[in-house]
Every structure is written in C-alpha cells, then in structure tokens.
A protein has these predicted regions:
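Short beta-strand-to-loop elements that line the ligand-binding cleft
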Residues: 29-31, 50-59
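Beta-alpha-beta core module
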Residues: 1, 61-110
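A bilobed periplasmic-binding-protein/Venus flytrap-type ligand-binding module shared by bacterial periplasmic
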Residues: 5-10, 104-114
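Secondary-structure junction motif
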Residues: 12-19, 25-47, 78, 114-118, ...
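Bilobed periplasmic-binding protein/Venus flytrap-like ligand-binding cleft at the lobe interface
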Residues: 106, 117-131
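Short beta-strand-centered segments that line the small-molecule binding cleft or hinge
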Residues: 1-6, 13-16, 42, 91-93
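A short structural motif in glycosyltransferase catalytic domains
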Residues: 6, 31, 57, 75-76
Length: 132
C-alpha cells in the first residue's frame, strides 16, 4: 500500500490530500522502472495522473532527507513511510489515487544465498518490511 509523504508543517499538512492538490504539488520520485514500485508510476500515467516531478533519485533512502527540508511530496510504500515519519519530522496521508496493491520482492545473487551475513540482512529486511 502506498501513501503520500511530506514534511510536517507543509501547506498540505492537516488537510485531506485531493487529486488536484496532488497534481499541483512538487514531487520527488524514486526511479524504480521494472520493479513493483515502478508499476505505481506506470499505473498513474495510464490513469492520466500527471505530477510535477522536480527531482528523481535512484532509491528511496534519500527521500526522507529531501522531504524534511523542502516542500516536495513523495509517493512511497506505507511501511517505508512508517520508518521515516519520526526521524525526519514527516507526515503521511492517504494517497488520492486508488493504487493497486503491489508485491515487492527481494533479490540476491545465488552465490550469496548461503552466506550468513547475507541471510541475516535478508531476514532483517523481511522482518521489517513484509506483511508476514
């Protein structure tokens, strides 16, 4: 499930996020073509939902840092937003577009499959972000 995330005190904070406000806002987007996350971008494009993309980043890790000091908003997985809200003084609201539920997969090279440190990291990621 995806939400919209932005800094506390943003002009959208405390209001229901409408589709019109979503379209008018400046967006930061994690470029994720060919992944589950990329499907969200493709879905919105097919539905005719245009965004004012002001910045693209190669991964979600940068988004919290960017949002806390700008007026941009981002479409992010709800589980990711939950981890970013307090550390970056952000808020998350329901997404104005009815997005489909999308499965996100974790991949690794076969040669690392039995490596203890890789197993530990995969387990940590699974425990933190899976719906179990």
């Amino acid at each position: 499930q995806y939400v919209c995330m932005f800094r506390r005190g943003h002009e959208l904070d405390g209001r229901k996020l409408t589709l019109d406000a979503f379209r008018k806002a400046d967006h930061v987007v994690a470029v994720s073509a060919g992944t589950g996350h990329g499907i969200v971008d493709e879905f919105m494009k097919k539905k005719g939902v245009q965004r004012k993309v002001r910045l693209t980043v190669p991964h979600f890790v940068a988004i919290g840092h960017i949002l806390r000091s700008t007026d941009m908003i981002a479409t992010v997985p709800e589980r990711y937003a939950d981890e970013c809200l307090e550390p970056f003084n952000l808020t998350a609201v329901n997404h104005p577009v009815a997005l489909p539920r999308i499965g996100i997969n974790l991949f690794w090279h076969a040669k690392f499959h039995r490596e203890p440190s890789n197993q530990w990291l995969r387990g940590l990621i699974f425990d933190e972000f899976s719906d179990k």
